[in-house]
Amino acid sequence: IRPASFWGIVGYKPSFGKISVAGVKSLAPTLDTLGSFGRCIEDVALGVAAMSGDHELANVVDLHNKPRVAVLKTPEWQYASPDTRGAIALARFSAETFAKGKVSDIDLPAELHQLTQIQTRIMLSEISRSLTFERMQYSKKLSNLITSQIDQGAAIEYKQYKLDLDQASTARNMM
C-alpha cells in the first residue's frame, strides 16, 4: 500500500474478498479492497485478523527463510521520482545485504504494458457510477478533481469498460 511506505508505517493489502467491504462506500468496486495500517506487523496482523475472521493471521511468527523479492520496472518507471528510485534501491540493498535474500529483476510482458491505462479507465468508469448519488444530490459540494473524474468516467463506453475488465482478468491470471 503506497501510503504506508511513504509514511514509514506497515501496510497490508490482502487479496480481493479477504475482508468484507459491506458498508463501505467504494469508488471502484473491482479494484478496491480493504487493508490495514499500523505501527508494526503485529498490529496490522491483528487488525486484518479481526476484520477478516481469519484469526490465524494474528499469530505472527518469525520466518527463517531468506526473502525472495522481485523488482518489476514497468513502462512507467521512467516517471519515477529520484526519491522513489532511491527507495527501491535501498529496499533491494537491504533485502540482499541484511536479510541475505535473493532479489530478481523481472520484465513485464509486452501484452501487459497497457495496464496503467486499463486500470485508469476501469477506475474512472466505476467512480462515475459509484458517485451517481453524490453527483445528482451534492454536485456543488464535490471537488473539481472528483467532478472531472466523474465526467471522464461517464465518457467511457460500457463496451470499453467490459473489454478493460476482461484484459485486467487476463493480466491477473498471467501474473
Question: Model-derived features: where do they sit?
Answer:
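A generic local structural motif
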Residues: H55-A58, A171-M175
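A non-catalytic, amphipathic alpha-helix used as a structural packing/dimerization or gating element
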Residues: D43-L46, A87-L90, L163-T170, M174
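Generic secondary-structure signature for well-ordered alpha-helical cores
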Residues: G17, V24, S36-E42, A49-L57, ...
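Gly/Ser-rich, acidic/histidine-flanked active-site/gating loops
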Residues: T33, A50-Q119
